[in-house]
Amino acid sequence: MTDLKLIALDSEDLEVLSAHVQDAVVRVPDMAYARADRRFALLMNRFDWESGRGRREKGLRKRAALHFDGVQSVATHGFDPAAPEGVLDLLAITFSPIDGPAGIVELSFAGGGTLRLGVECLEARLTDL
């Protein structure tokens, strides 16, 4: 199977991208904000939904990178962003517009943790590694 490469430039695109990363496992140390580049990136082990296996079957996981451009701010809630052994289960990614194309991207994790990115506009890329 070919590797997945997706880009999200609006809320509908992001819904598709979010579905592909649902139940992904993310290590806290594998998340980083490059302030000078206005980019937030994270590595994950995502469930390979395209393999056609159901939830109850032992599925495959793929290593993937997700990054957001035009990031102006980053805020976390419900987890320690400096935890060297922290592991999070990604549930969903949503976008809430605020002013024009600007808005908030929210990554929701199991257990109530959230990561909020203030962005100039929505631009996200998911790439299997």
What spans do the regions from the language model cover?
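Surface-exposed, interaction-prone regions used to assemble/regulate multi-protein complexes
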Residues: 1-129
